[in-house]
């Protein structure tokens, strides 16, 4: 059988074929609240009837008639009596009532016996135990669907803990789907039932003490509003509580009495405000209330009135479709007879196939007579009323608009005043010097005050700074409560906690934190002991005594090796007569013992020496020594600068292990702070030992504030364990304080909020924005820097030890060994190619070593063959005289005097040819050079000390 579909605006000519009465189609409506100033049900039925009868498409003169019967109380007897009055009138359907479950059950049974369709407009009661009649249809959404929708919302918000307030015991059966989900997910759902006094105050106090932030209320609209008003009196209507109402009429209640418009209230609605008749329908009801009532009871049409309006249209649509297939007739029935309406079953089949768009959305029924294929709108309370943030569809499930929800949170911060709890702590929050003349937030200054101003500018909120009552950050007590700022957040006495509040796992369990705005760690603060005053020999401090000793040994070793190598290598022995190469029997070595000791000194002082090494071995010794001195002098200069610019200070401990391994220096931290919790919960052996010491030490080593800890450090032998940021701040302002070692851990400061705060994401984004813009770093430099002590990485300069520069000593030793080896190779090579073949290698080696050990003179004769004569100098080839020549006296002989020039050249050439040792002819420029010789008193005639006098460059 095809589905019956018809719009409410168009009704074809169905009124032509009504057998029993060609002039009317009668419907009965039972109202249990028929007053004009209540729901407006009577008016809604009248509006539906008049709109149908005024339809221009209606053919014929038949009209829809709706007989209204009043039910003054929910009584089975009165309900049965009313039905006995309705049946003789020959009605095609019975509508209502809207709020009498017992009466509705009696009506369904009677209509089922007589096969007369019955439309319910109230939520189901006792779903598990009541059998739905075939003739009964319910336009109201089922409680099962509502419970599934609530479960979807809880999943969307990741809610694992909630409380359900029930006005009746039947709510556990009605919300079975919701309870089943909590059982499956193992989340926590506490159920609280209103007692006979109907006072929700005790229940709300229990919920507040349990710190439950999500509250589900399953009650009628009036009771739901009462619960919310009581919650407002207890301070539970704020941004940290979420209320979900299952009643579909709750959004029609007035919220003028709610002071805090940041409260997160969610509800459902089924109204179709886009319907063509919805605005006219609402205006008609509102006008009726204004004319007949002292006040308007609802902000919009009641749900029951809209459902009755849609029920009239559903009946008319089904009768129209049925009348097209067969002629129907309605005859009077009686309670006393067993007679039934013969067309009732057919009409019910057509009613189950009805599809139309009504004031309450899409109208369609399933095989059980329950409404299907519809959507529940999810509404959220704002300062401008409720607005839709999503919907739940029977077939498609939950669909939330996250953008609308997030924008509502941002809008709720706009121009909202937040209570900020904090604590006086330099430099985070301080009182101004003239704070007595100020009031409010103007009395305070510091890093946190400036950060609050930046956040307020971004998020557009106002704030009120309030100092915490007990002056502590917050620690758990034995009874489970918390002190300090954490306790105020748990009690919802404050919206934010802005201070040096450390993010810890224990605090994260009871409050929410924003992203960290500052990263830090625990450090050790201790006072420094001034070292001795600089002495006359403080210039020796850059190197440790061991380094100075090794440098002296290195100098002696280089001098000895240089003396040895220079004696061994033949390339350091040279003729002192430049003009008598090959003929002079004497060779000279410039590296005497004195010169060998002086040459390293000149290199070390970077002044050089007139002695130039000739052999490769001696040059190797010189190179490694110069490299050694380069590193040594550079290191000394750098470390000496540190000693001259930084005053040396001494501390008896260098690390946390040194502190833990001694008992002479007391150490402690702030009582009730995160540092104390860190040591208390640490599993590291060193930190456990430190905690046992601090916990058992008497008198107590814990302090109440940072200022007290600083004073104790300066006035006694005490080390203070505190955050590195505070350590840095106080070291900038007191040069007698120093940090020992590095950080003991890594953590961060965050903004504390109550659990479930809707502002958490907004503050996270704002903090990230400040970090990206470098604003937080700028604020930190503003409040941390500017002290009288310069910032130093380590104010205790130390002399360099062998572990720092030992490598250059290794290089020096290796170079010396290589030089000795090369000198021996040079000695052997020259000896093998010498003219004296009768002398053995060992004999020559022993002779040289004996000369080195005895420090003999650095002159010895040239080695010659046995019996050989000194070589004769070659005869100079006569050359033609040049046009000009330079004489030994420096005079020039030009071309104008050729005879004189030729005569002079011939004389000097003859002298050179006879072996004269005081005249030399340069083969390149043909210049004569004179050499004067004087006999040495200590040597033979061949042992001469030559003094060269020349008026030109050095000889060859």
Swiss-Prot record:
Keyword check for Signal: yes
Cytoplasmic side: 567-623, 826-956
GO terms assigned for molecular function: glutamate-gated receptor activity; kainate selective glutamate receptor activity; ligand-gated monoatomic ion channel activity involved in regulation of presynaptic membrane potential; transmitter-gated monoatomic ion channel activity involved in regulation of postsynaptic membrane potential
GO-annotated biological processes: chemical synaptic transmission; modulation of chemical synaptic transmission; monoatomic ion transport; synaptic transmission, glutamatergic
Location, primary (coarse class): membrane
Pfam family, one: Lig_chan
Biased composition annotated in UniProt, kind: Basic and acidic residues: 939-948
First and last residue of the signal peptide: 1-20
InterPro entries: ANF_lig-bd_rcpt, Glu/Gly-bd, Iono_Glu_rcpt_met, Ionotropic_Glu_rcpt, Iontro_rcpt_C, Peripla_BP_I
Compartments reported by the entry: Cell membrane; Postsynaptic cell membrane; Presynaptic cell membrane
Subunit details: Homodimer. Can form functional heteromeric receptors with GRIK1, GRIK2 and GRIK3.
Function: Ionotropic glutamate receptor that functions as a cation-permeable ligand-gated ion channel, gated by L-glutamate and the glutamatergic agonist kainic acid. Cannot form functional channels on its own and shows channel activity only in heteromeric assembly with GRIK1, GRIK2 and GRIK3 subunits.
Name assigned to this protein: Glutamate receptor ionotropic, kainate 4
Lineage of source species: Eukaryota, Metazoa, Chordata, Craniata, Vertebrata
